[in-house]
Amino acid sequence: MEQSSGRVNPEQPNNVLASLVGSIVEKGISENKPPSKPLPPRPSLLSFPVARHRSHGPHLAPVGSSIAQPKDYNDDQEEEEAEERFMNADSIAAFAKPLQRKEKKDMDLGRWKDMVSGDDPASTHVPQQSRKLKIIETRPPYVASADAATTSSNTLLAARASDQREFVSDKAPFIKNLGTKERVPLNASPPLAVSNGLGTRHASSSLESDIDVENHAKLQTMSPDEIAEAQAELLDKMDPALLSILKKRGEAKLKKRKHSVQGVSITDETAKNSRTEGHFVTPKVMAIPKEKSVVQKPGIAQGFVWDAWTERVEAARDLRFSFDGNVVEEDVVSPAETGGKWSGVESAAERDFLRTEGDPGAAGYTIKEAIALARSVIPGQRCLALHLLASVLDKALNKLCQSRIGYAREEKDKSTDWEAIWAYALGPEPELVLALRMALDDNHASVVIACVKVIQCLLSCSLNENFFNILENMGPHGKDIFTASVFRSKPEIDLGFLRGCYWKYSAKPSNIVAFREEILDDGTEDTDTIQKDVFVAGQDVAAGLVRMDILPRIYHLLETEPTAALEDSIISVTIAIARHSPKCTTAILKYPKFVQTIVKRFQLNKRMDVLSSQINSVRLLKVLARYDQSTCMEFVKNGTFNAVTWHLFQFTSSLDSWVKLGKQNCKLSSTLMVEQLRFWKVCIHSGCCVSRFPELFPALCLWLSCPSFEKLREKNLISEFTSVSNEAYLVLEAFAETLPNMYSQNIPRNESGTWDWSYVSPMIDSALSWITLAPQLLKWEKGIESVSVSTTTLLWLYSGVMRTISKVLEKISAEGEEEPLPWLPEFVPKIGLAIIKHKLLSFSVADVSRFGKDSSRCSSFMEYLCFLRERSQDDELALASVNCLHGLTRTIVSIQNLIESARSKMKAPHQVSISTGDESVLANGILAESLAELTSVSCSFRDSVSSEWPIVQSIELHKRGGLAPGVGLGWGASGGGFWSTRVLLAQAGAGLLSLFLNISLSDSQNDQGSVGFMDKVNSALAMCLIAGPRDYLLVERAFEYVLRPHALEHLACCIKSNKKNISFEWECSEGDYHRMSSMLASHFRHRWLQQKGRSIAEEGVSGVRKGTVGLETIHEDGEMSNSSTQDKKSDSSTIEWAHQRMPLPPHWFLSAISAVHSGKTSTGPPESTELLEVAKAGVFFLAGLESSSGFGSLPSPVVSVPLVWKFHALSTVLLVGMDIIEDKNTRNLYNYLQELYGQFLDEARLNHRDTELLRFKSDIHENYSTFLEMVVEQYAAVSYGDVVYGRQVSVYLHQCVEHSVRLSAWTVLSNARVLELLPSLDKCLGEADGYLEPVEENEAVLEAYLKSWTCGALDRAATRGSVAYTLVVHHFSSLVFCNQAKDKVSLRNKIVKTLVRDLSRKRHREGMMLDLLRYKKGSANAMEEEVIAAETEKRMEVLKEGCEGNSTLLLELEKLKSAALCGRR
């Protein structure tokens, strides 16, 4: 049914219906004459798109009513009455009841926590049943007159401004208030609902409402005396205490309601009872205490971090924002200006609409208010709200990127918490995704484009593209990564509770239902609901948008010929969706004619000028082509590739034709050509278009050659030109990857399917032209003064040039790997001479001695690059420098290897007269001559990597990969998290350091025991902690370096030379080192680099039959697949965060001894002998790392691992069996680690006031008691009292262990009756004071001691002198005889009476009681006999006092005293 526009024609008196729609405000020009004075607007805005009530018109009366009857049926009087009713319809509409959505009473962040960790939406949406008070609101009586119609708005405003009066029929305190403060006059009319600003509603028509109305009518008929009498009768029947509680609560609620301001707490009952008649509930929050710290310290449980974060997010609910995205401070707008009555979500639109004077939006808007305003019936208000949301999200992202990585917000920090704002906006309460999806269907173009802008901010389109643009320039792997938010799966007991588990998608791919119609082909009923869509959006906003069918809407917008701005924005959104996950990429590819529409829109512009949407179109196709090889081949086959890359061939003659386009057009054309060349690169990597090199190379010659920079500098086009040139060289690098073997015989050029070496020589000449001009362009001799705006793009260009040259040189190899080269291509020494001549390297010792010390001048290009890396504040400039260093280093290493290989072919040294110094350097070895400078660069990056890995590790603070769901840069983490340029810079530095480690392999064979070698080992360990999902090769190289036999031999030397070791014996042959190296490398590679097999549902199989439950359960922790690391989507150039483990946790090296008892990490159950061998090698490796950690000059990552993890690993390895400590070498190593960690524990205990240093339950796992049961069960079954095994078990009785774990350990040991198997106190780890001090004060632990005493679990322990017996005697003696605290009297008396009563029943424990009576810590035998007698007498008095006069117990004490005096035990 169409609605009227609201315009009334005065010449048509019969057009009465149209005049009744005045409350629907729309744009338009009224046909009436403008009044002399503007009429006030009507505040009848409705929530959009909630259905309007029929009273808002058109007014078609039901059949049978007087309005619907024919004209001749009504007489004049009835017609007049009907007309009068129509005239008063506006006032009637004020009390109409529109359709209501389900109300959310308050924000519950616990629901969010359940949502992000669970998979069933039904479990998160169960309403909490609570007792609700019945509310009756007074309203003015309805008067059916013309005056009432004209004054309806004023009446509604007056009703809103008036205080609401509440009546509760079944609660006496409220009836009392009714008769005193808020008594209703006898002539008052029945209560009606009050307008809420966005809609009105009647009182409920339920039975409770009817009873309410009846009670209220009864009250009207009663006199004041009768009301007072009824009140007194009710008060007499109620409990006074209950009455007092209810009265205080009512007064507190009234006081808070009157004086509430932003941030003031309010009880849940008040929040539920205030404005419950509105469409939205006014958000009220509890007062949030400031957290002390959000940094995850070893002693802070994960639950505390989550609670602190939840409080921060809740605080963001009441923040108000201006239209520029800034937070409106509380003191900017006074309460009198904003008005307390305009503080709720339901009144934001009416506030702005009514307050035409001044600035209606000066008070700002909360996020929920802005979302509510986005559903207004006025398009202008919808646009305004969406622009505000875009500003807030954009501001939040920019602020997050400006903050530090791993930044911990402290209590004193009063700045705006943008992390919490971003998380709240994307959270489940505002339902932003649902509002945006509905706004995208708006019929106003301005609203749609404003909505798309918000989605762009929501998906961080611009920031993510900047990140991927840098990623394109980096090498050498060149892989993209999907942006879907992820979280770590929970640690498992079978894997030793180690962190660093597999990443999982926040929203399961199976829940991203892109096309509902495909699932409904079998005729089943669609059970998907908006609730499920919102649930998925709460886990991942991009997944929620796809599930809400955003792709069909985007396709429809593209088909309707949108504006250039809208087209560019929606394609940008599509790129973000394609980058999200494989499921989203597949959804775009499978959508009918989606790609064809993109290509068609690209081809509509036949002119030479470039549109921004064309750039995004090519970028989208490139992202889709990266997904898999078949997609790329299809694009080439169906002509899509050719249709979008023709611009590359338009500038082939000279540079002038391009420069004449102008600055803006040149910028757009260069950006388009860059994307087209990247599309070429993707196709080449997929094996397509390689044979088309002769066609492409002439078009690239303009950009490959060095141009006239005076013309470019004059037009300010250096950055635009060099960006195209850089990408052109990267395309040549991709072509170089496909070069055939140079020395293979008879390879036909046209039949090989690839380009050949005949094109390499002109390509090298073009590259050398850039090297020749490098000193003039970069001017590195001036140092820091040479840095300009174009320096970054020039360095990216030189990085591409060096990468291309190094790739060509690496492809030159003989047919056999060990065979020498038959001959050397002439361009190899040509490249070397160019590098030497133009001072890309320094060969002077004097220059190297001042390396990096003088910022005003640099002696070489390498020094200049290293200087920029250390001193530059621009991360992209530093990244370009590191990549340029990487390419240069690879080039000189390849030149050195090729020349040496060619020389080895010569039978006798070839005597050639060397004419120049440059040729002399090349003959002596370019790498050897520049080794001093390379060493300086290596040391610089070694220090850098050692300082960067803690920053990368600090990002994983919360349970999920980021602080909020969605594709936001870094998933909402501070500084961008894993997606920041700072992390990219650290990973690039680690990659360069890996190259330097490979260079130094040949030199490290003779530096056994040196500090330099240990620095390299520590830097390799740090590299493992920095590497991301794209850096598998980097981690494998680090494993190879640390685990090679020579490195293991060096670790053995460090163990033997460790001064902390008391006695140690080690026997191992060279073959043993090779065997351990192989086993450890295989284990670590399989444990940390093996990807997880994906289930069928995650592969995106279409046609899944939907049942009654839409969000089905998928078993996340299935068995590993048989595929290797590279088998997972090997043809894809985009990798996933999910299904892999990197970045590795700091304690990754403990996995060899922490997870050996489980077969989950392999394809089948491993053999027990293999497990044992891995465990033995793991114990040796751990001992070596611990011993060598103090030898290097750099801090070792091993030292940073908390001691609790190391003790836990030593306990875990014992689950393999006794074989692990029956082997002589392994037993010595295990004993050595115990002694070492015991010393570390004593040092930490003396240096820290906090006694609980070993928090096994808090730091390892909350169910650690289960693990303890396994350890004790193994100890009781196979140990036979082994001292080494017993020492490890006794660690859990140390006073540095948290009391809950001590209690669990003691209980398990006591129940298993193995307390007597524990060693004596002098044989335990560490000093004895660690077990005895501080004195035990936990009552649960003391009661466990007492229970073990009385049940006989300590009888044998007393005979054998077990540490368990010593602990009990010491703590009982300290509590009973030394602790005189009054709060311990009852516990002391309980222990005394229980011990004496037990003695009366079991006389054989008299010796144990005498030990308790005579015990004195550490010096019992040194005491004189008189002192002993006096002390015994004093202690007997304490025991008698504890018996509290019990004659039976006192008699037993007399017997004990006699035995003590006689010296009898």
Curated annotation (Swiss-Prot):
InterPro entries: ARM-type_fold (IPR016024), MINIYO (IPR055326), RNA_pol_II_AP1_C (IPR013929), RNA_pol_II_AP1_N (IPR013930). Disruption phenotype: No visible phenotype when heterozygous. Embryo lethal when homozygous. It comes from the Eukaryota. Keywords: Cytoplasm, Differentiation, Nucleus, Transcription, Transcription regulation. GO terms for biological process: cell differentiation. GO terms for cellular component: cytoplasm; nucleus. It is found in: Cytoplasm; Nucleus. Residues 27-85, 186-211, 1113-1135 are annotated as: Disordered. Expressed in root and shoot apices and in leaf and flower primordia. Detected in the endosperm, embryo, meristems and in organ primordia, but not in mature cells. Found exclusively in the vascular bundles in mature leaves. Belongs to the RPAP1 family. Positive regulator of transcriptional elongation that is essential for cells to initiate differentiation. Interacts with RNA polymerase II and the Elongator complex and is required to sustain global levels of transcriptional elongation activity, specifically in differentiating tissues. Interacts with HAG3, NRPB3 and NRPB10L. Over-expression of IYO activates premature cell differentiation and confers resistance to the elongation inhibitor 6-azauracil. This is Transcriptional elongation regulator MINIYO.
